[in-house]
Amino acid sequence: MKKLTILGSTGSIGTSTLEIVAAHPDRFQVIALTAGSNLELLKQQVEVFRPRLVSVLTADLARQLDRMLSDPKPEIHHGIPGLIAAATAGEADVVVAAIVGAAGLVPTAAAIKAGKDVALANKETLVTAGRIMMDLVRENGVRLYPVDSEHSAVFQSLEGQSGKDVKRIILTASGGPFLNLPLDRLSRVSVADALNHPNWSMGQKITIDSATMMNKGLEVIEARWLFDTPAERIAVNIHPQSIIHSMVEYVDGCVMAQLGVPDMKAPIAYALTYPERIPTGVKPLDLTALSGLTFLAPDYQRFPALKLAYDALAAGESMPAVMNAANEVAVEAFLKGKIGFTGIATSIARTMDAHEPHTLATIEDVLSSDLWAREKSRELIGLS
């Protein structure tokens, strides 16, 4: 039986992970859960899965949760120390890192240092601190299993192959809700429009990132570290049907691809059970029902955020961390109606222009760059 800690259990990835656990009680046991402020859902999860430890955002929320739960209660923690306690819980074999944004960096690093294998759904961990994190993975002899559908597809397409035989990695992207919208209308799209993803059901932040294609940019940077592949050998193709989740092209001209209906339970389950596979309840793919599979090159005029991600990766050092933090601030500002949709990429670019890249040697260096970028981005947007 595999014992799990789930960081971010009330989010989209966390709830899907627990659906898999519930479907296979003979294979999985939940040791620890963490959440932000969704106490009602966390309470339900605690009652069903009976973790030994839980953690929430603040001390006040921890007190509220304690009042909501009946005996026997788990240990209740809060804040960064609580996340670290969950990530390093002794019994856990695998830590599912599903916290959104840079907040997932510290607990994920703690899990790796504690010798835990990590099912990584938090792409910002490698975006902001890729070199540091991969060094930690090697030093501690643990495995990092990708949960993102695209990286899971690449991982599966690389199975049994030698890295020297890979010509390039091709990440696919749906193009989001604005793929065919006239460019002059992009500045006027609403939050509701941007949250209406055509294929995937996800949290708000990643859905906006998909609309700008920053999500794909983050995945390019993540792929650079996960698969030790330079940016010039990582391509992006827009594939509106989201059936082919990514591809690997080999030097002999052959291309290996992973296909399936858009459902995150499939890559989550593979990360949890590798190298085995288990039933997930995912709808079977019926190729005869498809009218066709189409592919397009990304248009940087429509999706400038993707170009910014490639630029950040080329600049290296602290720039990806700065870009990521600026994006988080800009997306939050858009969701709150403070800036327009096209203002997201503009704000990120201005923050990057104001930054001089420098070496990141420690997690603390990453967090310092992250903080600088958040403050600068808020200043440029006019939020501070």
From Swiss-Prot:
InterPro entries: DXP_reductoisomerase (IPR003821), DXP_reductoisomerase_C (IPR013644), DXP_reductoisomerase_N (IPR013512), DXPR_C (IPR026877), DXPR_C_sf (IPR036169), NAD(P)-bd_dom_sf (IPR036291). GO terms for molecular function: 1-deoxy-D-xylulose-5-phosphate reductoisomerase activity; manganese ion binding; NADPH binding. 1-deoxy-D-xylulose 5-phosphate binds at residues 123, 149-150, 174, 197, 210, 215-216, 219. This is 1-deoxy-D-xylulose 5-phosphate reductoisomerase. Its cofactor is Mg(2+); Mn(2+). It catalyses: 2-C-methyl-D-erythritol 4-phosphate + NADP(+) = 1-deoxy-D-xylulose 5-phosphate + NADPH + H(+). Its EC number is 1.1.1.267. One of its GO terms (biological process) is isopentenyl diphosphate biosynthetic process, methylerythritol 4-phosphate pathway involved in terpenoid biosynthetic process. It comes from Geobacter metallireducens (strain ATCC 53774 / DSM 7210 / GS-15). It is an enzyme of class 1 (oxidoreductase).
